[in-house]
From Swiss-Prot:
The keyword Cytoplasm applies. GO terms for molecular function: GTP binding; GTPase activity; translation elongation factor activity. Catalyzes the GTP-dependent ribosomal translocation step during translation elongation. During this step, the ribosome changes from the pre-translocational (PRE) to the post-translocational (POST) state as the newly formed A-site-bound peptidyl-tRNA and P-site-bound deacylated tRNA move to the P and E sites, respectively. Catalyzes the coordinated movement of the two tRNA molecules, the mRNA and conformational changes in the ribosome. GO terms for cellular component: cytosol; ribonucleoprotein complex. InterPro entries: EFG_II (IPR041095), EFG_III/V (IPR035647), EFG_V-like (IPR000640), EFTu-like_2 (IPR004161), G_TR_CS (IPR031157), P-loop_NTPase (IPR027417), Ribosomal_Su5_D2-typ_SF (IPR020568), Ribsml_uS5_D2-typ_fold_subgr (IPR014721). The modification Diphthamide is found at residue 596. Belongs to the TRAFAC class translation factor GTPase superfamily. Classic translation factor GTPase family. EF-G/EF-2 subfamily. The keyword Translocase does not apply. GTP binds at residues 28-35, 94-98, 148-151. It comes from Methanococcoides burtonii (strain DSM 6242 / NBRC 107633 / OCM 468 / ACE-M). It comes from the Archaea. PROSITE patterns: G_TR_1, G_TR_2. This is Elongation factor 2.
Length: 730
């Protein structure tokens, strides 16, 4: 306890000097060794015993994580490291590598300024490595590289000294190629990783040693000595001479930015307010005396303290009893406690200044992505965009009717804790639908509802979430209000792919300045008139008001858009979410008396015009795809390719390395249920595989009627396919 207390004192002493702080994330593909690396960094800081490091998985504090051997949630910890005679505070977040939990990585990247990208020396860069690197660069988070499992390269692949260096060099080149391809401007500004400079370290997290060029100069240990130690399997001596925590933490302190250096560039990317305003200037210098600007990146439940909101404090200081505004809430919230994380433990402190990662209780209105501030009316931070979308859904029911009210509350809570989860109540069937990133994601959530929340549930087998879109143009189509006093005339057409890409990458939103948005839309191919007339963006769909001088339209527009968003959430063909739909309001006739153009009149008229127009414009379904990467011995290759091709999959590429073949393929998500067991059988358990979200592609016409009818029956709709006339006012 004494050691822990001493650590807290050191942490709080360093908190108030942003120059001595490094906020970092550890990111990688699944099983490349992130959590083992984190544990050894903690052991080096004296926070867990060296004997248990790498085996304790301190950062995987959840029972499910220990059982499955994977990281599911991001874990935070603050620790102290001495570099060149000075103490530094490292706020570290260990993130998941499994594609189903990629949302945690995205959110963690908003909280940190630098990332240690971990790569397995044998496997090299894998799909999730690319995804997390792209996410880091998008959030202006600077990377350094740790090549792990170098001992495997030497002892399992039996490479010699020279070949080892060639292979490691190729790996570094590949990472730099990725960085350059994703953000050339940053690459040219010095964000490439370079072993000679010191932004790359090599080692073994499991055996607790690491080496880098600065470390070699410091210790006098050469590459050939490292090779010999590994050959002789004398990892203990290597760990004594070149302790992992020293090489990696030195690299973090020297090459990753402090909050002061980082926030100058980062604030512009994640906040669209006026940078010359008081709060804009305070955030760019991490001013602890300024107004509070705190972004929530994670919400978890504490059995004693309730909801804990964790996030990054960009300016001001947080302390107990403070009244703050939460974006989207009408009343202020009172902070009850502030603290820092030590793995599973949250330690209370009196106050936390700007530049730190803080854990706060009492923010009852907070949600992931919320802006918390002492400044009323502050422009909120840019919302957090996730790389993948929820593509698998299950229906959830309480086993016992008495638990139904509790289940409703629990589902609200888990959706708040994990924003990549979408919870909806199916009005027709009364079922609660839970949509997530994949089978494993939903399995883990269902297990937690039972284990942590104490509600017994039953779930249906997983189903795929499709997308509705249109391939043609239709309109103007008239929509009449039930009282016949209001009429709307709309045209629908496919939204330009370039505009969809801008929306998907979060490069345009209705919150950005109009002139900036208009310029971006025109550059993406819209004419000036359309670029000026966009009035709403919902998911990857857009609504344009092309009318001129219509009386009462302004005060009715909110209701018209409500009709639009209702259709985009549940399209006319099968009540699946819509994507890539462009709706243009060409004309409108409105009753002069506001009583006759209320929500019950305007919303149905707006909705039905769009529904009918979409069915006239060849409404169709797109299905989600995943890329599937398989590593398999050559003699098992046939079984693996057959398994993919038997699931409507296609082989994109095949490469061989030694006696191993790497297969890159893609297949529809609907065909990949049960793939884990089948690929094991097909390859005698010798295949290693991973997946990555690959977007949506048209559902083959041969399957369309069967799939649409199946979805409609499941949702309690008429099995017969709808016609435009069904939605047109008589």
């Amino acid at each position: 306890m004494g050691r822990r207390k001493k650590m807290v004192e050191r942490v709080t002493a360093l908190m108030s000097n942003p120059l001595m702080i490094r906020n970092i994330g550890i990111v990688a593909h699944i099983d490349h060794g992130k959590t083992t690396l984190s544990d050894n960094l903690l052991a080096g800081a004296g926070m867990i015993s060296k004997e248990l490091a790498g085996r304790q998985l301190f950062m995987d504090s959840d029972a499910e994580e220990q059982e499955r051997g994977i990281t599911i949630d991001s874990s935070n910890v603050s620790m102290v490291h001495e570099y060149e005679g000075k103490e530094y505070l490292i706020n570290l977040i260990d993130t998941p590598g499994h594609v189903d939990f990629g949302g945690d990585v995205t959110r963690a990247m908003r909280a940190v300024d630098g990332a240690v990208v971990v790569i397995d020396a044998v496997e090299g860069t894998m799909p999730q490595t690319e995804t997390v690197l792209r996410q880091a660069l998008k959030e202006h988070v600077k990377p350094v590289l740790f090549i792990n499992k170098v001992d495997r390269l030497i002892n399992e692949l039996q490479v010699d000294d020279q070949e080892m260096q060639i292979r490691l060099g190729k790996l570094i080149d590949h990472v730099n190629k990725l960085i350059k391809g994703m953000n050339e401007e940053r690459y040219n500004a010095g964000w490439r990783v370079d072993a000679a400079e010191g932004t790359v370290a090599f080692g073994s997290a499991l055996y607790n040693w690491a080496i880098s060029v600065p470390m070699m100069k410091k210790t006098g240990v050469s590459f050939s000595e490292v090779f010999n130690y590994c050959r002789e399997e004398d990892m203990k001596s290597l760990a004594e001479k070149c302790p992992l925590h020293e090489a990696v933490n030195d690299m973090v302190i020297r090459f990753l930015p402090s909050p002061i250096d980082a926030q100058k560039g980062r604030v512009g990317a994640i906040w669209h307010g006026d940078h010359e305003s008081g709060i804009g200037k305070q955030m760019s210098v991490a001013d602890a005396k300024g107004d509070v600007a705190f972004m929530v990146t994670d919400i978890s439940m504490d059995p004693h303290a309730g909801e804990v909101s964790t996030g990054r404090l960009f300016s001001g200081s947080l302390s107990r009893g403070m009244e703050v505004y939460v974006s989207g809430a009408s009343k202020t919230n009172r902070i009850q406690q502030v603290g820092v994380f030590m793995g599973p433990e949250r330690l209370e402190v009196d106050a936390i200044p700007a530049g730190n990662i803080a854990a706060v209780t009492g923010l009852r209105d907070a949600f992931v992505g919320a802006t918390v501030t002492t400044l009323e009316g502050m422009e909120p931070f840019e919302s957090i965009k996730h790389a993948s979308e929820p593509v698998v859904t299950v229906a959830v029911e309480a086993k016992h009717m008495k638990d139904l009210p509790k289940l409703v509350e629990v589902l609200r809570q888990v959706a708040k804790e994990d924003p990549t989860l979408k919870i909806t109540l199916d009005e027709e069937t009364g079922e609660h639908l839970m949509a997530g990133m994949g089978e494993l994601h939903l399995e883990v959530i269902a297990h937690r509802i039972e284990r942590d929340k104490g509600v017994e549930i039953t779930t249906t087998p997983p189903l795929v979430v499709y997308r509705e879109t249109i391939t043609g143009t239709a309109g103007p189509v008239e929509g009449k209000s039930p009282n016949r006093h209001n009429r709307f005339y709309v045209i629908v057409e496919p939204l330009e792919p370039e505009v969809r890409e801008l929306i998907r990458n979060d490069e345009i939103s209705m919150r950005m300045p109009e002139v900036e948005r208009r310029e971006k839309l025109m550059a993406a191919g819209l004419n000036k008139d359309e670029a000026k007339k966009i009035v709403n963006i919902f998911e990857s769909n857009a609504y344009f008001d092309m009318t001129k001088g219509i009386q009462y339209l302004n005060e009715t527009m909110e209701l018209i858009i409500e009709g639009f968003t209702e259709v985009m959430k549940a399209g006319p063909l099968s009540k699946e979410p819509c994507m890539g739909v462009k709706v243009k309001l060409m004309d409108a006739k409105l009753h002069e008396d506001a009583v006759h153009r209320g929500p019950a009149q305007v919303i149905p008229a707006s909705r039905q015009a769009i529904q009918a127009a979409m069915l006239m414009a060849d409404d169709t379904l797109f299905e989600p795809y995943q890329k599937v990467f398989i590593q398999v011995p050559q003699e098992q290759m046939g079984g693996a390719t057959k398994e993919i091709q038997g699931r409507r999959g296609v082989i994109i590429d095949m490469t061989s390395e030694g006696d191993t073949t790497v297969i890159e393929s893609k297949a529809p998500v609907s065909e990949l249920f049960g793939f884990a067991g089948d690929i094991r059988s097909a390859t005698e358990g010798r295949a290693m595989w991973s997946t990555e979200f690959a977007g949506f592609e048209p559902l083959p016409m041969s399957l369309m009627t069967e799939v649409v009818t199946g979805i409609r029956k499941r949702k309690g709709l008429k099995a017969a396919l709808p016609q435009a006339e069904d939605f047109m006012s008589m």
